[in-house]
């Protein structure tokens, strides 16, 4: 399974945003400094998040970004979908008639990896930004 930096950084940046969302809009520069993520990379990520209406931008000197929904309503799978991140544990195309690796049947461990992928996706469908913010606060105490 491969989760790219784009997906990890999108989640990290949104958790940061969710922590400060009730105060004022948060600038990408502030997120960049706090999380050690390139500002240019954050701009690319937030462009996708804005298009999928996960965040909205606020213009002006006190501008920045705010969540478009409550943190509890934004699930990790929504974030991954917004930045075109797919969790894939099987190498084959599940819909292929050829099976795994171009053969006529599935590979011996196909069902294992397919089941793992389902568990991961179910986890991401249930876990919200609010959960991650609360978890972060509890671990710091």
Regions found by a protein language model. Give the residues of each.
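Basic amphipathic alpha-helical segments that dock to polyanions
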Residues: 45-50
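The C-terminal cap of the DNA-recognition helix in HTH/winged-HTH DNA-binding domains
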Residues: 19-22, 33, 51
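Key DNA-contact positions within bacterial/archaeal DNA-binding proteins
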Residues: 40
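A short alpha-helical element within helix-turn-helix/winged-helix DNA-binding domains
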Residues: 26-35
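C-terminal regulatory/oligomerization modules of transcriptional regulators
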Residues: 94-141
């Amino acid at each position: 399974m491969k989760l790219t930096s784009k997906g990890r950084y999108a989640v990290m940046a949104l958790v940061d945003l969710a922590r400060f969302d009730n105060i004022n809009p948060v600038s990408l520069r502030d997120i960049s400094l706090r999380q050690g993520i390139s500002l240019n990379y954050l701009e690319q990520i937030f462009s996708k998040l804005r298009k999928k209406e996960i965040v909205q931008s606020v213009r002006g000197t006190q501008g920045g970004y705010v969540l478009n929904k409550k943190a509890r309503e934004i699930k990790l799978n929504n974030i991954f979908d917004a930045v075109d991140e797919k969790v894939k544990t099987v190498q084959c195309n599940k819909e292929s008639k050829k099976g795994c690796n171009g053969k006529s049947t599935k590979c011996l461990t196909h069902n294992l990896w397919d089941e793992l992928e389902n568990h991961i996706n179910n986890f991401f469908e249930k876990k919200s930004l609010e959960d991650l913010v609360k978890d972060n606060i509890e671990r710091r105490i």
